[in-house]
């Protein structure tokens, strides 16, 4: 979404987004604290994705106990970002609260997706998908804070660098 300025009012948001904002307020009441005279902006990020994992040997059709299992994850994530530049500080801060829901196993359609790409590119297909992890729901909630040294002004031409410190808690 575009950056939003000022106080958040969940009742003014579309219902699913408003529910998510209320959930964040319940799970982490301090997230919506007033930033006072500190400049702050916020936005919502929606992620949809698929991850897949396979053992190293693509030709084996049996379960390989000492290798990574066949697994897929199909997920939808909502992340709320708040960017704050404390007045007296020499850094910017990004606070993120993210909720990810998904499915693991055949419901993730990882085998079908991988086979589609492998057929289209003429790559040998993996043969052991019958041994993938079973269907189950996936859930993750993340709280993260990132710090970046603040540099005022426009981007300078040429090479540059960034140092971003962070800490996070992920449950799920």
Task: Give residue spans per PLM region.
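N-terminal ordered "arm"
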Residues: 1-22
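Outer-membrane pore/translocation modules
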Residues: 30-172
């Amino acid at each position: 979404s575009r950056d939003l300025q000022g106080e958040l009012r969940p009742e003014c948001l579309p219902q699913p987004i408003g529910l998510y904002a209320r959930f964040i307020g319940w799970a982490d009441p301090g997230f919506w604290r007033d930033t006072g005279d500190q400049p702050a902006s916020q936005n919502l990020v929606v992620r949809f994705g698929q991850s897949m994992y396979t053992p190293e040997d693509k030709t084996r059709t049996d379960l390989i106990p000492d290798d990574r299992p066949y697994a897929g994850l199909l997920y939808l994530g909502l992340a709320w970002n708040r960017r704050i530049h404390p007045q007296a500080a020499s850094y910017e801060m990004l606070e993120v609260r993210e909720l990810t829901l998904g499915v693991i196993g055949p419901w993730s359609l990882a085998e079908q997706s991988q086979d589609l790409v492998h057929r289209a590119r003429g790559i040998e297909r993996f043969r052991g998908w019958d041994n993938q992890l079973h269907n189950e729901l996936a859930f993750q909630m993340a709280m993260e804070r990132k710090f970046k040294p603040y540099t005022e002004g426009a981007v300078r031409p040429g090479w540059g660098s960034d140092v971003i410190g962070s800490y996070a808690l992920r449950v799920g």
